Curated annotation (Swiss-Prot):
It is found in: Mitochondrion. Keywords: Mitochondrion. Belongs to the GEP5 family. The gene is GEP5. The keyword rRNA-binding does not apply. GO terms for cellular component: mitochondrion. It comes from Kluyveromyces lactis (strain ATCC 8585 / CBS 2359 / DSM 70799 / NBRC 1267 / NRRL Y-1140 / WM37). The keyword Mitochondrion applies. It holds the Pfam family GEP5. One of its GO terms (biological process) is mitochondrial genome maintenance. This is Genetic interactor of prohibitin 5, mitochondrial.
Length: 305
């Protein structure tokens, strides 16, 4: 145990000056950036192992010295607004489909089928309504008043973001998620679930209660937010440049350089509206077959067999 602590202590001291400088000044960074790094720093102090040190270094370069793209920022700032337009699929609707393999969003996402993106719609659904919200019963109003088309008074919903901005942001979020799902080696969680809300049925065949459905939307949005920001953040070009300079620093010893290469092995970028693998990561893993040429995919399959 003592020898292990000494090795870890030596490894920490051998970290690049950029990393150590950021850690020493963590409290000078914006509060929203401090959280992840302080959490990892506390974990390392409580249990100083190579694994906790890697997580600390990862947090410094992927959170403290990095900035999330706009769509992730909006997801974190306006989760309730986005949840109201979040795509979903009812379990009973899957049972009614002629060929769920071609039209079920849940199945398409489970198979990493790109058609899953085409089936998405971002419309205001009927859940997560304001308190005391009531949908007018037009037939009942007509029976009582004898007037057709008369609307009852109801609470007006006010969104903190324009609906079009919400839909644009959701489109980018789901493209971001699809990129990670089809490149699992980039992810802390290797097998990602479908990002849509899956609404189940009760044993009697009816849909589950609305309050439970509300919670499904809230939980799903939080899960996706944590995954895109905390667990698998995308690097800015500046953050990538810093990591590249560290990995290529000739003064780093072999063990420390290996640690940084491990940290950088999940690097990817968001440029000009598209996601791409960073050169820092390309040497560390193989992309999903969907992103490989046919010849390369066949060669890898043959090698695997």
């Amino acid at each position: 145990m003592k020898a292990s602590l000494l090795r870890t202590s030596k490894l920490y001291k051998g970290l690049h000056s950029i990393t150590k400088d950021a850690i020493s000044k963590v409290d000078t960074f914006p509060k929203n950036k401090q959280h992840e790094t302080l959490h990892r720093l506390n974990s390392f102090n409580e249990n100083p192992t190579r694994k906790t040190l890697e997580k600390l270094v990862y947090s410094v370069h992927f959170h403290l010295l990095n900035d999330p793209p706009k769509h992730v920022d909006i997801l974190r700032q306006y989760p309730n607004e986005l949840a109201k337009f979040w795509p979903y699929e009812m379990q009973h609707s899957i049972l009614e489909m002629d060929d769920p393999n071609l039209t079920s969003q849940t199945i398409l996402w489970s198979r990493n089928n790109k058609d899953a993106l085409d089936f998405l719609s971002f419309n205001r659904h009927k859940w997560l309504r304001p308190k005391n919200w009531q949908t007018p019963n037009e037939e009942l109003i007509k029976d009582i008043t004898g007037i057709d088309g008369l609307q009852s008074t109801q609470i007006t919903e006010v969104l903190r973001l324009p609906a079009e901005k919400i839909k644009e942001t959701l489109r980018q979020i789901f493209e971001h998620y699809y990129f990670l799902k089809t490149n699992p080696k980039l992810c802390a969680t290797k097998k990602l679930q479908a990002p849509i809300v899956e609404i189940g049925m009760k044993p009697d065949g009816f849909d589950i209660a609305d309050i439970r459905i509300d919670n499904l939307f809230k939980k799903k949005v939080k899960l996706i937010s944590d995954l895109l920001y905390s667990q698998n953040p995308v690097l800015t070009s500046d953050a990538e440049s810093i990591l590249t300079s560290i990995v290529n620093d000739p003064d780093l010893n072999r063990r420390t350089k290996r640690l940084y290469k491990n940290v950088a092995s999940r690097s990817y970028l968001f440029k000009d509206g598209k996601f791409e693998i960073s050169e820092l990561a390309r040497g560390g893993f193989v992309l999903s077959k969907e992103n490989l040429s046919e010849n390369l995919a066949a060669a890898l399959e043959e090698e695997h067999n």
